[in-house]
Amino acid sequence: MSSKKSLYPDGRIPDRLPDGRPAVAWRSRWTEGVLPLWLVATAGGMAVFFVVGLFFFGAYTGVGSA
């Protein structure tokens, strides 16, 4: 966890400084903390398409394909 004091009641830390600059450098966003949700969702979606594709390929070429 971060040692920064939260300004919000739900524990979030603001992502911008008062002067408008990002609070965290762009390089640190990829090397610290949790993975971005869009990256996790993209990888999960690709995995689902791959597995479903394997089922269709197996039905076309495998046992029971006539």
Swiss-Prot record:
GO terms for cellular component: photosystem II reaction center; plasma membrane-derived thylakoid membrane. It is found in: Cellular thylakoid membrane. It is a single-pass membrane protein. One of its GO terms (biological process) is photosynthesis. Keywords: Membrane, Photosynthesis, Photosystem II, Reaction center, Thylakoid, Transmembrane, Transmembrane helix. It comes from the Bacteria. One of the components of the core complex of photosystem II (PSII). PSII is a light-driven water:plastoquinone oxidoreductase that uses light energy to abstract electrons from H(2)O, generating O(2) and a proton gradient subsequently used for ATP formation. It consists of a core antenna complex that captures photons, and an electron transfer chain that converts photonic excitation into a charge separation. Belongs to the PsbJ family. PSII is composed of 1 copy each of membrane proteins PsbA, PsbB, PsbC, PsbD, PsbE, PsbF, PsbH, PsbI, PsbJ, PsbK, PsbL, PsbM, PsbT, PsbX, PsbY, PsbZ, Psb30/Ycf12, peripheral proteins PsbO, CyanoQ (PsbQ), PsbU, PsbV and a large number of cofactors. It forms dimeric complexes. This is Photosystem II reaction center protein J. It comes from Synechococcus sp. (strain CC9902). The gene is psbJ.
